[in-house]
Amino acid sequence: MESLNNRLDWLQEQLLTLYEKDSKDIEDQIMQWNLLRQEQVLFHYARKKGIMRLGLQVVPSLAASQDKAKTAIEMTLYLSGLRDSQYGSEQWSLQDTSREIFLAPPDHTFKKGGQTIEVIYDEDPNNSTRHTVWRHIYYQNGDNRWRKAASDVDVHGVFYLEYDGVKNYYVDFQEEANRYSKTGRYTVQYEGKRFTNVMSPVNSSPLRTSGSPTDTNPATQGQSTQTARKAETKGSRHHPKSPAVRKRRPYGRRRSRSPRDTTLRRGEGESARASAGSGERVAFISPGDVGTSTRSPPKGGQSRLRRLIQEARDPPIICLKGGPNQLKCLRYRIKASNSSDFESISTTWHWVHNKCTDRVGHARMLVRFISTEQRDRFLDKVVVPKSVSVILGAFDGS
């Protein structure tokens, strides 16, 4: 008990020293998060031993200390990567590397030099919202390299321009107007520029995407929001064919799935349907039929051979949808801990609009499996963050 008290006193003394030092060195910020992790590990150990108080400090619950320790580990990993990049030599304060700033929009990025802008709805100064435009945004791209960008504002929202010229919106003015405005009209003033959208019905569908709230060509910023919506609706008919979607998986405990009937394929006669003891006859599939099914074969009432043949038509996948940095962290974790539970995994990617390079929707990542059993095993083992959607599907070919 006394040794735990002494250890806690030492950790908190080191933290106070860092706070008073007010260092701008990223190494000190990494040290701070390491000390916070050690503090939570100590609390976790004490609680497991039934200790409810260390000195004057109340020991938090096991869940609380575990969650805070994981947060500290995550921040340490992000900051260590940033330190090893070309931006590690810049000045980094405690505020710059705080969890609150890291999760502020755009989330999972480091930010500096915040400036507040105001969006006024219905030309009523009392009906407004405020958002932050950042002078510097540090984000990771698809190959985990750190990049630096700056926020900007247009009539559609607040965004930052990525290194490949793609606008990544993190505030959608039209979506906000649909929530707070009676008329759908809003006005934004930023650095001497004034943006006002044209009148649009409040109950019309917002152009809501993670990457780009408008999904329209930047050259059409002066056009009406309603016209932009028509462009999006028209463009949606020409999106590339997506993997066949079956259903979303709820978070937490897996939901049992009832068997589905499988339609009879070309080349399958009555022999493929008949099953008479050991003399079961099955029709083998042609190479052209591989990967063409979009249904899961029934799990019961058939031999393993028949199931394998049916699965050959249906290479199963899952599509993970969420924030790009969240997906990158998840990919790193499952490659390190669950490499035997999947066949291959993609990099993060986005749909883009058919008229321009603006990104459409959340980031996505595909995981491919050799069988539905392997996919089920993967979903049973891997804990997916609540903010990441899981969609089951299949490729039209492998």
From Swiss-Prot:
GO BP terms: DNA replication; DNA-templated transcription; regulation of DNA replication; viral DNA genome replication
A Gene Ontology molecular function term of the record: DNA binding
Chain residue numbers at which the record places covalent cross-link Glycyl lysine isopeptide (Lys-Gly) (interchain with G-Cter in SUMO): 321
Subcellular location: Host nucleus
Polar residues composition-biased segments: 197-228
Region (DNA-binding domain): 314-398
Region feature (Disordered): 197-304
Residue ranges, compositional bias (Basic residues): 236-257
Known partners and oligomeric status: Binds DNA as homodimer. Interacts with protein E1; this interaction greatly increases E1 DNA-binding activity. Interacts with protein L1; this interaction enhances E2-dependent replication and transcription activation. Interacts with protein L2; this interaction inhibits E2 transcriptional activity but not DNA replication function E2. Interacts with protein E7; this interaction inhibits E7 oncogenic activity. Interacts with host TAF1; this interaction modulates E2-dependent transcriptional regulation. Interacts with host BRD4; this interaction mediates E2 transcriptional activation function.
Region feature Transactivation domain, mapped onto this chain: 1-205
SUPFAM superfamilies: E2 regulatory, transactivation domain, Viral DNA-binding domain
HAMAP family found in the cross-reference section: PPV_E2
Family: Belongs to the papillomaviridae E2 protein family.
Protein role: Plays a role in the initiation of viral DNA replication. A dimer of E2 interacts with a dimer of E1 in order to improve specificity of E1 DNA binding activity. Once the complex recognizes and binds DNA at specific sites, the E2 dimer is removed from DNA. E2 also regulates viral transcription through binding to the E2RE response element (5'-ACCNNNNNNGGT-3') present in multiple copies in the regulatory regions of the viral genome. Activates or represses transcription depending on E2RE's position with regards to proximal promoter elements including the TATA-box.
Gene name in the database record: E2
Keywords for this protein: Activator, DNA replication, DNA-binding, Early protein, Host nucleus, Isopeptide bond, Phosphoprotein, Repressor, Transcription, Transcription regulation, Ubl conjugation
Stated name of the protein: Regulatory protein E2
Chief localization: host cell
Biased composition (Basic and acidic residues): 258-271
Signal peptide annotation: none
GO cellular component: host cell nucleus
